[in-house]
């Protein structure tokens, strides 16, 4: 499959770019986490260390993979692709549990730091990285992984990029493999949050002022969420744009146990899930041949 490798820029990536620039300053791993860690998991504090940062990822990997039916034994022979690895918060745990891991991100500097993080807290011999240069396509061959995992990443992409990455996930997954993809959908607060986000992203485009705003936590949290996608929107796109010879089965939409979620697409199981943000939902599915 041929891909367009021309780089594209998305304004909501500005905080990641700013954080990525700071990872290249030569500071220690702990200093980098204190300066940029909140971009990935909202943790802050002058005493935050890389080890603390990775421990939060270890816990979430354990919890989510258990909820999705993947214990350590089930992962031992699997190659996992992580869309949106950042500097390796969750990647380290994946390398300790899986046969091999491919970490991808829109920022090449993050991938360099991811390699360093895994070197300290994971198994770097199992890791390779791939830059998502255009924000929408994976520079990987067809049928090369068993699991595609993405958490708190697709919501920061442009809508069309997030949908493209969803079908790209299918493309690179082998027959019988699994998709574990996290999205954000509409909640009442979005009536105010989305217009504020649009305004903030416009401010980020202003020279000097924009760069300063993009490194502040409050500004970033307003402007970095670029889309809202319902399960039916994602499933309709996948149905219409599935890679040749592939389809998804065993489709489950997992949503917060504190909310009610309705899915109109036929053949989809809807399940409540504990400890999930009210605005988030997960798509889990098996990739099969047609």
Task: Annotate each language-model stretch with its function.
Residues 79, 100, 144-146:
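Structural signature of beta-strand start/N-cap positions in the alpha/beta core
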Residues 136-147:
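A short acidic, Gly/Pro-enriched loop at the edge of an enzyme's catalytic core
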Residues 147-160:
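A short SAM/SAH-binding and catalytic strip from SAM-dependent methyltransferases
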Residues 163-175:
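A short glycine-rich, Lys/Arg-flanked "PGG" loop and its adjoining helix->strand segment in the class I
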Residues 2-77, 87-127, 131-137, 157-162, ...:
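Class I (Rossmann-like) S-adenosyl-L-methionine-dependent methyltransferase catalytic domain
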Residues 82:
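Class I SAM-dependent methyltransferase core
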Residues 78-79, 174:
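Residues that mark the start of a beta-strand
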């Amino acid at each position: 499959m041929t891909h367009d490798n021309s780089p594209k820029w998305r304004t909501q990536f500005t905080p990641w770019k700013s954080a990525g620039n700071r990872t290249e300053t030569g500071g220690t791993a702990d200093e980098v986490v204190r300066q940029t860690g909140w971009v990935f998991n909202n943790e802050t504090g002058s005493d935050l260390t890389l080890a603390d940062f990775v421990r939060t990822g270890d816990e979430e990997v354990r919890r989510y993979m258990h909820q999705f039916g993947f214990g350590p034994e089930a992962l031992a022979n699997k190659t996992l692709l992580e869309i949106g690895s950042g500097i390796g918060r969750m990647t380290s745990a994946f390398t300790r549990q899986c046969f091999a891991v491919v970490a991808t991100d829109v920022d090449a500097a993050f991938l360099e730091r991811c390699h360093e993080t895994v070197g300290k807290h994971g198994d770097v011999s199992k890791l390779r990285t791939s830059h998502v240069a255009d924000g929408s396509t994976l520079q990987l061959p067809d049928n090369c992984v068993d699991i595609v995992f993405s958490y708190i990443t697709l919501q920061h992409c442009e809508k069309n990029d997030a949908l493209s990455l969803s079908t790209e996930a299918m493309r690179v997954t082998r027959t019988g493999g699994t998709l574990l993809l996290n999205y954000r959908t509409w909640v009442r607060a979005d009536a105010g949050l989305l217009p504020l986000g649009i305004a903030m992203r416009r401010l980020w485009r202003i020279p000097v002022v924009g760069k300063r705003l993009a490194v502040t936590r409050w500004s970033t949290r307003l402007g970095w969420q670029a889309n809202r996608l319902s399960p039916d929107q994602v499933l309709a796109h996948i149905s219409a744009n599935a890679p040749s010879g592939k389809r998804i089965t065993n489709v489950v939409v997992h949503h917060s146990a504190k909310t009610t979620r309705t899915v109109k697409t036929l053949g989809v199981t809807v399940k409540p899930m504990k400890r999930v943000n009210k605005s988030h939902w997960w798509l889990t599915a098996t990739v099969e041949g047609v």
